[in-house]
Amino acid sequence: MVSFGSHTDFSVPHIQIRALNKTYASQGQHVHALKDIDLDIPEGKILGIIGKSGAGKSSLIRTLNGLEHPSSGSIKIYQNELTTLDHDHLIKLRQRIGMIFQHFNLMSAKTVWENVALPLKVSGYDKAEIKNRVDEVLSLVGLAHKADQYPAQLSGGQKQRVGIARALVHHPEILLCDEATSALDPESTSVILNLLKQINQELGITIVLITHEMQVIREICDQVVVIDHGEIVESGQVWSVFSNPVQPITQELLSLEQLELPFDLHREINANSTHSILRIKYQSEAHRSPDLNNILSSFDTPVYLYQSHIDTIQQHLIGNLIIGIPKLDLNINTLQQKLLPFIHHIEVIGYARPTH
């Protein structure tokens, strides 16, 4: 089971998923889209679900509001079992769960105001209630001045803000985001992510978003779940997963293996090898700078620095160094112990003959 947060009471998580499976029939075969998913999501947090295309992200998020019915398993929203609800109760539950989509799903023949008002009209609210609520959410997303315009007159980012406003009209407790920024340019993406953070902080709404972009996870998520072939393969607080990704798929998504080094790197020692190439990872609280001098001077030999990257995530400073040491017989365990006060991981990633 995956749970998050050391100070959260998980006796009643906002969303509780147990042994969730989803199987599709495709061309005479069974495709296992979700495999034994166990997940607790606390109230008021932003959870990011990341994975490659076809990993099972969309299948998972669509089960959370009943758009997909799982083949087996349990989904509870505040202890209410979603999988056994009848149609009428499922409709009521969906009003507590907003959803925004990659391609906006706006009605082109209706104005911005009418698009946002539509869910309330369908639910039978009176005109005064509809007007007050639509005006309120359009102001929240910064589009009150666009109320009478049509989708064709809006930018992609503005269309997505309309989608967010529409998702908020029923005062939802949960907001599901299905690749909400993948169709947007970087500037619009930044606006949408800032808006989602604002909604989470001001309204306390639990947000679950799926994406294939690690930058989205980095920007706004509290926790991250990595899905591969329908299974949760890695999870944790964002800073922790980013600083020390364990699974190959997570490392690939973070592009840690895509090194741009000015020489050929070999996995094994060969006749041309003169240096061991090492990756060093270190982390600290954001207000404490790493002591790079102590790290590099601990080797008692010349150290060649080929790559350095420092990032700040969730008030944690995360660093990666790629260095070269003119030794081929390094004892990594001894080095790890020697450097332990300054780093949390060191590994040999290959051997080379650098030209410096």
Swiss-Prot record:
Q: Under the GO molecular function aspect, what terms does this record hold?
A: ABC-type D-methionine transporter activity; ATP binding; ATP hydrolysis activity
Task: Tell whether Glycoprotein is among the UniProt keywords.
Answer: no
Looking up InterPro entries in the UniProt record yields: AAA+_ATPase, ABC_transporter-like_ATP-bd, ABC_transporter-like_CS, ACT-like_dom_sf, MetN_ABC, MetN_ABC_transporter-like, NIL_domain, P-loop_NTPase
> Which amino acid positions bind ATP, per UniProt?
G51, K52, S53, G54, A55, G56, K57, S58
Q: How does it sit in the membrane?
A: Peripheral membrane protein
Give me the reactions it catalyses. Answer: L-methionine(out) + ATP + H2O = L-methionine(in) + ADP + phosphate + H(+); D-methionine(out) + ATP + H2O = D-methionine(in) + ADP + phosphate + H(+)
ABC transporter domain boundaries: 15-254
Q: Which GO terms describe its cellular component?
A: plasma membrane
Which cysteines pair up through disulfides? They are none
Cite the entry's keywords alphabetically: Amino-acid transport, ATP-binding, Cell inner membrane, Cell membrane, Membrane, Nucleotide-binding, Translocase, Transport
The answer to whether UniProt assigns keyword Transport to this entry is: yes
**Which compartment or compartments is the protein found in?**
Cell inner membrane
Quote the EC number. 7.4.2.11
- Report the SMART domains cross-referenced here: AAA, NIL
Q: How does it assemble?
A: The complex is composed of two ATP-binding proteins (MetN), two transmembrane proteins (MetI) and a solute-binding protein (MetQ).
Function as written in the Swiss-Prot or TrEMBL entry: Part of the ABC transporter complex MetNIQ involved in methionine import. Responsible for energy coupling to the transport system.
Q: What family does this chain come from, according to its entry? A: Belongs to the ABC transporter superfamily. Methionine importer (TC 3.A.1.24) family.
What name has this protein been given in UniProt?
Methionine import ATP-binding protein MetN 1
